[in-house]
From Swiss-Prot:
This is Queuine tRNA-ribosyltransferase catalytic subunit. Catalytic subunit of the queuine tRNA-ribosyltransferase (TGT) that catalyzes the base-exchange of a guanine (G) residue with queuine (Q) at position 34 (anticodon wobble position) in tRNAs with GU(N) anticodons (tRNA-Asp, -Asn, -His and -Tyr), resulting in the hypermodified nucleoside queuosine (7-(((4,5-cis-dihydroxy-2-cyclopenten-1-yl)amino)methyl)-7-deazaguanosine). Catalysis occurs through a double-displacement mechanism. The nucleophile active site attacks the C1' of nucleotide 34 to detach the guanine base from the RNA, forming a covalent enzyme-RNA intermediate. Zn(2+) binds at residues 301, 303, 306, 331. Disulfide bonds: none annotated. The lineage of its organism: Eukaryota, Metazoa, Ecdysozoa, Nematoda, Chromadorea. Substrate binds at residues 89-93, 143, 185, 212. It catalyses: guanosine(34) in tRNA + queuine = queuosine(34) in tRNA + guanine. GO terms for cellular component: cytoplasm. Residues 243-249, 267-271 are annotated as: RNA binding. The active site is at 89 (proton acceptor), 262 (nucleophile). Belongs to the queuine tRNA-ribosyltransferase family.
Length: 400
C-alpha cells in the first residue's frame, strides 16, 4: 500500500491511496457492508457510482458465515463479487455496541454470539487471523474500545491496552498484501490522545485510525479531538476517523486533515424514508408534504433514483415496500460519494473557504421546493456554534 498526497489546502489533503484492488482517492467515504452485503444495494450498483472501497465487519463475518467459509469461497472479494478495495474493522467496536454480551481482559474479548448464543474468544491474534482469512486490502488492529463518555482510570487503561494489543497484532500480521492500521484511543482527553498518537506513530507503517468517537459526545468535543489527533499524526500517512457519516461531519473532518471515513448512516436512515440532500440536509419522504411532490429527491443528483423516480412515488411506498429503502439507499450512498468528490475538488483547487460557505448555506437552508417564490422567503437555519468554531480553527470565515 502506498499513499500519495497530491494537494494541500490548510489542514486538508487530497491524495491517492494505492491498494491491491483499486486506487482510492481521498478524502473518501466508505459505505458499510456489515456481513459482506450492502443493505438494499448490490455491488454492480456500487461500481456504477464509482465506489472504490467499502467496509465489512470482522466480528459479524467471523460469526456468520464464518471466516473459514469465506476463505474457502476465495476470500471476501470473490464471495461478494467485488473487485475493488475492502477495509475490515477488527471487532473492537462491538465492545460498545454489544457490551451486554461481552467481557474484556488483557488476553482479549469474549463475546456471546447474538445469533447462536455461542461464546467466541477474540484475542488480538484471532482478530488478525480472521481478517487475513477474509482477505481485505486494509485490516484494523484489535483495540480496547470504551464508550466515548466514559471517564476515570479506565480511559487511560484502555488506551495503553490498545497499544499493547497493537504489538501483538503486528506479530500476528503475516500477509504483505494486506495493510494494517493502528487505532488511536484516549477518549475525550486530548493529552491521552496525543500520547497515544505518539506511540501509534512509532508503530504505524501505512496509516492510522482515530477510534472511539461518534458515540454521543458533544460535537464541540468531537471536532476538537479530531483536530488534535490529525495535528499529532505523521503527515505522510492517511488518517481514518472511524464511524463518521453525517455530511457536515465529513466536510468538517476532511478540512481538519482527516482522509477516510465510514458509517452505516446512509443505508440505515434510508430504511426510515430519509434522504440526504445538499439543500436542507435531510428529507423525510414519509411526510405528507411530499404526497404530490413530483420533483426528484435532488435535481442535481445523477443517481438512478433521482433520474427515474419522484419524491411522490417514494412517499407512496415508504414504509410499505422494500424497494423504497433500496431507492433511497442508492441515492444516499451516491450523495456521500459525490460530496467527497466535491471536497477533493475544493482541496485540489484551493477553494475550501468558498466551498464551506456554499455547502453550509445550502445545508442549513430550505429544502428545494416546487414553489421557488416560497423557498426564497425562507431563511437559512442557524449554523451550529461547533461548526463555526471548527471553521474558525481552520482559519476560514463564513459570510452569513
Amino acid at each position: 500500500m502506498k499513499y500519495d498526497v497530491l494537494a494541500r489546502a490548510g489542514f486538508a489533503r487530497r491524495g491517492n491511496l494505492h491498494l491491491p484492488h483499486s486506487i482510492v482517492e481521498t478524502p473518501v467515504f466508505m459505505p458499510v457492508g456489515t456481513q459482506g452485503t450492502m443493505k438494499g444495494v448490490v455491488t454492480e450498483q456500487l461500481v456504477a457510482m464509482d465506489c472504490r472501497i467499502l467496509l465489512c465487519n470482522t466480528y459479524h463475518l467471523g460469526h456468520r458465515p464464518g471466516h473459514e467459509r469465506v476463505k474457502a469461497a476465495g476470500g471476501i472479494h470473490k464471495m461478494m463479487n467485488w473487485n475493488r478495495s475492502i477495509l475490515t474493522d477488527s471487532g473492537g467496536f462491538q465492545m460498545v455496541s454489544l457490551s451486554k454480551l461481552m467481557t474484556v481482559d488483557e488476553n482479549g474479548v469474549n463475546f456471546e454470539s447474538p445469533h447462536t448464543g455461542e461464546m467466541m474468544a477474540l484475542p488480538p491474534e484471532k482478530s488478525i487471523e480472521i481478517q487475513q482469512a477474509l482477505g481485505a486490502d486494509i485490516m484494523m488492529q484489535l483495540d480496547h474500545v470504551i464508550h466515548v463518555l466514559t471517564t476515570g482510570d479506565i480511559v487511560k487503561e484502555a488506551m495503553h491496552r490498545s497499544i499493547r494489543w497493537l504489538d501483538r497484532c503486528k506479530v500476528a500480521h503475516t500477509r504483505d498484501d494486506q495493510a494494517m492500521f493502528p487505532i488511536l484511543q484516549g477518549g475525550l482527553n486530548l493529552d491521552l490522545r496525543k500520547e497515544c498518537a505518539e506511540e501509534m506513530a512509532k508503530r504505524a507503517k501505512v496509516g492510522i485510525a482515530i477510534g472511539g468517537l461518534s458515540g454521543g459526545e458533544e460535537k464541540d468535543h468531537f471536532w476538537r479531538v479530531v483536530a488534535a489527533c490529525c495535528a499529532a499524526l505523521p503527515p505522510h500517512l492517511p488518517r481514518y476517523v472511524m464511524g463518521v457519516g453525517f455530511p457536515v461531519d465529513l466536510v468538517i473532518c476532511s478540512f481538519l486533515g482527516a482522509d477516510m471515513f465510514d458509517c452505516v448512516y446512509p443505508t440505515r436512515t434510508a430504511r426510515f424514508g430519509t434522504a440526504m440532500v445538499r439543500r436542507g440536509g435531510l428529507m423525510q419522504l414519509n411526510q405528507k408534504r411530499y404526497k404530490e411532490d413530483f420533483l426528484p429527491i435532488d435535481d442535481k443528483c445523477k443517481c438512478n433514483t433521482c433520474k427515474n423516480y419522484t419524491r411522490a412515488y417514494i412517499h407512496s411506498i415508504a414504509g410499505k415496500e422494500t424497494v423504497a429503502c433500496h431507492l433511497v439507499s442508492i441515492h444516499n450512498i451516491k450523495h456521500q460519494l459525490d460530496l467527497m468528490r466535491d471536497v477533493r475538488q475544493a482541496i485540489q483547487s484551493n477553494s475550501v473557504e468558498k466551498f464551506l460557505r456554499q455547502f453550509l448555506f445550502d445545508y442549513y437552508g430550505p429544502i428545494q421546493s416546487e414553489n421557488p417564490s416560497k423557498q426564497d422567503t425562507e431563511k437559512v437555519q442557524e449554523v451550529p456554534q461547533w461548526v463555526r468554531d471548527a471553521v474558525d480553527h481552520m482559519g476560514y470565515t463564513l459570510d452569513f
